[in-house]
Amino acid sequence: ALEKMGVLGETLQSAGDKISGVGQKLLPVTAGVTALGTIAVKTGADFDSAMSKVAAVSGATGSEMDALREKAREMGSKTKFSASEAAEAMNYMAMAGWKTNDMLSGIEGIMNLAAASGEDLATTSDIVTDALTAFGLSASDSGHFADILAAASSNANTNVSMMGETFKYAAPVLGSLGYSAEDSAIAIGLMANAGIKSSQAGTALRSAITNLAKPTGTVASAMEQYGISLTDSSGKMYSLRELMEQLRQKLGGLSEAEQAQAAASLFGKE
């Protein structure tokens, strides 16, 4: 699939411009979402039932549950979702292994992303909790990660759900190499603009990065031929953004056919 980055010409050629452009557009999701207006906090049977599930899954008791209840009500008053839906979101987070403090600090980013993107809370919770784990981030980073996803999806031909599917396959490898969530989102956005999306993008990106990180045979020869390296002369890892810029510089001047050949040699085929 990464062979399709014979579109590599257009994709990598414009990577530099788009990288800086997306970077400047990481505007807080929360601004627009809070403006949706205050919706009455729905309590009662649904809310109590949902909070009971949270208690059962998370093991939270006493003052912890009081804090979670209060937070759920707060989310019900400041987002388009009800307090009961906020409680359901907490249940998804608890199932992902988040503890009370994680849920208290992370729920706002998840709910704001769900509201801004139109995705349901279950999908959004899965995307955020899984990706934060892969990139070694904490629950308190959920708001920042939500902003990254919202900005990248609005500036590329993709959406939060498809980006989440890509992250599912690629994030563990990207995170293990120390690549940032920001740079990863930009790479995924660029691939989406080249017509490579969702799980296809995830498996392609995972394969490409794995090939470059542990090159053998054809890949090692191609990296030497085109002067591609994941590390600088001192052995320090380049960031993913620097790697993309390196690919743009080394391959951007090739003909379309040569770029397709380079892509096949460097990234392999899924």
Language-model features: locations:
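Membrane-penetrating hydrophobic segments
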Residues: M5-T30
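Glycine-centered helix-coil hinge/cap
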Residues: Q24, Q261-E270
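Small-residue helix-packing and pore-constriction motifs in hydrophobic alpha-helices
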Residues: K25-S77, E88-A96, M103-S117, T123-A156, ...
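Short amphipathic alpha-helical segments that mediate assembly, nucleic-acid/protein binding
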Residues: A86, Q259-A260
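Alpha-helical protein-protein interaction modules
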Residues: E245, K250, S255-E258
